[in-house]
Amino acid sequence: MDSRTGENITAHQAENSVFIWEVPNPLYFKIMRVEDPAYTRTRIYHIQVRFNHNLRKALDLHKAFLNFQVWTTSIQASGTTYLNRFRLLVLLYLHRLGVIGINNVIRAVQFATNKSYVNTVLENHDIKYKFY
C-alpha cells in the first residue's frame, strides 16, 4: 500500500523493474537493531533495505524502504556479520535474475532467508510513489 495516499499498489507498479546493470549500487542495506530476547535461543535482526536515488527515479518512486524482522536461532552471528551474508545473498539473487524491482527484492529476501536457522520473517514496508 502506498503509505502517502493509502491506495493499494497495482500489479504493474509492483512488477515494474529495471535492468540491474543500468543502476549502480541499487540498494542500501542497514541494520536497525539486533534483539536478544531473554531466556530464549533466538536473535532478532531488524534490517532495512532502501532503494537508492537512481533506482527510485527509474521506478517512479518517491520513497522505498523495505523493513524486515528476521527471527533466527543463530546466536553466534553478530549484526554486521549477518547483514553481510544477507546482503550478499540478496544481491546474488538479483544479479542472477538481471532485473530489480519491488517484488524482485522481496523475492530475493525470501531466497536469502530460506535457511534452516531462520524461523520467521516479518515485513513492514514504507513505499511512496510520485504523484506526477
From Swiss-Prot:
Q: Which Pfam families match?
A: Gemini_AL3
Domain of life here? Viruses
Q: What InterPro entries does the database record attribute to this sequence? A: Gemini_AL3 (IPR000657)
Keyword set, alphabetical order:
Host-virus interaction
GO biological process entries: viral process
Subunit and interaction comment? Homooligomer. Interacts with the replication-associated protein (REP). Interacts with host proliferating cell nuclear antigen (PCNA). Interacts with host retinoblastoma-related protein 1 (RBR1), and may thereby deregulate the host cell cycle. Oligomerization and interaction with PCNA are necessary for optimal replication enhancement.
Give the protein's function: Increases viral DNA accumulation. Enhances infectivity and symptom expression.
Q: What is this protein called?
A: Replication enhancer protein
Which species?
Answer: Bean golden yellow mosaic virus (isolate Puerto Rico-Japan)
